[in-house]
Amino acid sequence: MQDKYTPAEVERAAHSHWTARDAYRVTEDAGKKKFYACSMLPYPSGKLHMGHVRNYTINDMLTRYLRMNGHNVLMPMGWDAFGLPAENAALKNGVPPAQWTYDNIAYMKKQMQAMGLAIDWSREVATCDPDYYKWNQWLFLKMLEKGIAYRKTQVVNWDPVDQTVLANEQVIDGRGWRTGALVEKREIPGYYLKITDYAQELLDHVQVGNPNATLTGWPDKVRLMQENWIGKSEGVRFAFTHDIRGEDGQPIGDGRMYVFTTRADTIMGVTFCAVAPEHPLAAHAARSNPDVAAFIQECKTGGTTEAELATQEKKGVRTGLTVTHPLTDEPIEVWVGNYVLMGYGDGAVMGVPAHDERDFAFALKYGIEIKQVVLVDGETFDYHRWQDWYGDKQNGVTINSDNFSGLSYQEAVSAVAHALQEKGLGEKKTTWRLRDWGVSRQRYWGTPIPIIHCDEHGAVPVPEKDLPVVLPQDCIPDGSGNPLHKHEGFHAGVKCPVCGKAARRETDTMDTFVDSSWYFMRYCDPKNADAMVAGGADYWMPMDQYIGGIEHAILHLLYARFWTKVMRDLGLVKVDEPFTKLLTQGMVLNHIYSRRTDKGGKEYFWPHDVEHIQDEAGKITGARLKNAVGDLPAGTPIDYEGVGTMSKSKNNGVDPQELIEKYGADTARLYTMFTAPPEATLEWNDAAVEGSYRFLRRVWNFGVKLAGIDAAATEAAIQGAQSLQDVQFGKEAKALRLEIHTVLKQVDYDYQRMQYNTVVSGAMKMLNALEDFKSADAPGGLVALIEGFGILLRVLYPATPHIAHGLWSGLGYAGSLGDLLDAPWPQVDAGALMQDEIELVLQINGKLRGAIRVPSGADKAEIERIALASEDFHKHAAGAAPKKVVVVPGRLVNVVV
């Protein structure tokens, strides 16, 4: 064993050993308790970042710990390989997306292997592989057969830069989630999946407080995010009537404009209605009203989601049309509002300014009447200022509402619903915020939708025998839209499955969230050419622990749940939910430094080029360049923006490869685990990285020290540490074993809780105790030392497997106890936790005066005798005779004098 800790050599030797043993390949084993632990598969962007390192190390620690405890653990890995970045890189570099993607996969896989992750690479999948996406297409056809997939034309979010449709969840503040371009609204035909058919089940299983919820192993924050996104609302759907006729002379919408409300108790306070820009009444008004036409055109930019509309300025325009109030017969003005979504409900809303904050602001802006119809006792209504109680439905009572006055919220809703139903104009109804999932994308690098377009028979499904529809690998996007339109090879020889005439393929591809909605099931049986999933999924699913960022709380996690339920209903899997437990690891943060350029833009600087300016209290007040950067000399003042998520754009990322090359993979792993609990954010600290490296060097140096002991004595000590039956431990050895096993008990508990930062701190306590032990020659001393270091290596092994393997093998543990790959988790020795003596607090008249040591089994009389004979008692009692002695077992003695 080498004297100096050289991470590159230690890690190279460990990798060679693990590869030779094919250490991490797993198979189904009915004789073992299974555990499926999986990190969200990465997009092959080119290089790992520190967030990847943290995520995968969390997974690896869990995997190795459970294997040491006898579990059959699956830890697979794959690549979310389709998507727009590959097309954009191809456009920039002039190479096909396939080449760019597979080159990145090769490099990132090499990085993962350098990290020493216990991944079963025999189960690797790439979603751009035809053998994988064939099953996307196959299940899509099954969904078509069952009516779960369907085609329709709808207003969608159009990203003008990427030339594609975006799902509602992919629009942020009115802009595309990837490009930042202002999103437009367009009517485009596409394929949709009926996720709404599963809305109630999706809600029931995730809802916080629901006794039928099954996802209790998920963070409440994620569960609430999904619950709010699904958005179940109980209310009343009713119609305002009208006689507005279209160009055909018929009443538009059969003379009814429907709305949905959860506040039917305020129906008597309606003073206007607003319709979406795409509503038939808006289109009718636009034909004769230029202001309406111009407003509708303006509304075609921006998002189509509730989230986007909630943040943008609320605007509207009068249509000049009126509808009739269903209960009062009063005429109600119709407006076009940019905040009304055609895809939600009926594309129209009632306006009650007095009791809805959005309507209140809208009414003040445009001079619309405000009519109070709810009163909370003791409050005064102000027509010029919104107050939160205006919307209070729990404590309010209806007023100014004719026959409905004096009613509570529930009473009024029921009464109004009954009245509307009596008139045939409305009824109680449940609505959902969730909308069907549009999966068509006007891009090349994705799963081809298996549809053939025939002039005679329209859209015809591709026969199953012709799957997969293979994506051409030679396309290089030129920025002018979907290259599949122009790729004649993609359409060559295609015939209609119905009539046999020449036809063309569908050129839309599937949303890449389709790929990630079931990959975790394919891991269970990745090479099966005959079935999407088979017996492997029955053994491994549901996944026991899923690990990934909270940014996937709605998109990926909701779609994966839906996809699993569809597969269940098709008889493909037996589980209702894919993920039993979810851990959302915290972001990795770093300092951000910038300055304004002469042109008004921002220039960001790498942290290693910057030094802080601090006040007397040590608070950072500014920053300056430590080194010259470009034309800027050292000492140039720059702005300190605080800490934020690591990103390339802000030059505050840390390259894991550089970290591994300088300190080794074990240091990178240890640092990301020690600095913060897995679910908390991690603020990068170079000094703490150095500290992690120094700790591992201390571990290695202690191993070298043990290696210097006589080999025969060491081997005998290892054998002794294995059985302990014939070992007589002296006082010093017992004290060491007490400390080691006390820490081990806590560490084991922390491993079970996945609190890996305290696992590492426990390992540090163990090393301190071992280094402080100076009685190797005392009775049982060497055995206690060897046992303790063997425990430390096994505690560290899940976090830092390379150095643990090197020391375990180099010191001879493997010869007696077997390969560390197969070593069981160390068990806490109850005997080691038993103390010959314990320390009790000594009090005199209730005041702390010292401490005494007593035999651990001492009775009350013996404890009293020792207390009264102690030096501390005689010193503080000053000759006073004891009147009473109170003993609290295991804690203290109080002498009353």
From Swiss-Prot:
GO molecular function annotations of the record: aminoacyl-tRNA deacylase activity; ATP binding; leucine-tRNA ligase activity
GO biological process terms, semicolon-separated: leucyl-tRNA aminoacylation
Principal EC category: ligase
Alphabetic keyword roster: Aminoacyl-tRNA synthetase, ATP-binding, Cytoplasm, Ligase, Nucleotide-binding, Protein biosynthesis
CDD domains with a match to the protein in the record: Anticodon_Ia_Leu_BEm (cd07958), LeuRS_core (cd00812)
Binding site for ATP: 648
PROSITE patterns: AA_TRNA_LIGASE_I (PS00178)
InterPro entries: aa-tRNA-synth_I_CS (IPR001412), aa-tRNA-synth_Ia (IPR002300), Leu-tRNA-ligase (IPR002302), Leu_tRNA-synth_edit (IPR025709), M/V/L/I-tRNA-synth_anticd-bd (IPR013155), Methionyl/Leucyl_tRNA_Synth (IPR015413), Rossmann-like_a/b/a_fold (IPR014729), tRNAsynth_Ia_anticodon-bd (IPR009080)
Cysteines joined through disulfide linkages: none
EC assignment: 6.1.1.4
GO cellular component labels: cytosol
Lyase is among the record's keywords: no
Compartment(s) of residence: Cytoplasm
Catalyses which reaction(s): tRNA(Leu) + L-leucine + ATP = L-leucyl-tRNA(Leu) + AMP + diphosphate
Residue ranges of the motif 'KMSKS' region: 645-649
Placement of sequence motif 'HIGH' region: 42-52
NCBIfam families in alphabetical order: leuS_bact
Family assignment from sequence similarity: Belongs to the class-I aminoacyl-tRNA synthetase family.
Protein name in UniProt: Leucine--tRNA ligase
Species this chain originates from: Paracidovorax citrulli (strain AAC00-1) (Acidovorax citrulli)
Organism ancestry: Bacteria, Pseudomonadati, Pseudomonadota, Betaproteobacteria, Burkholderiales
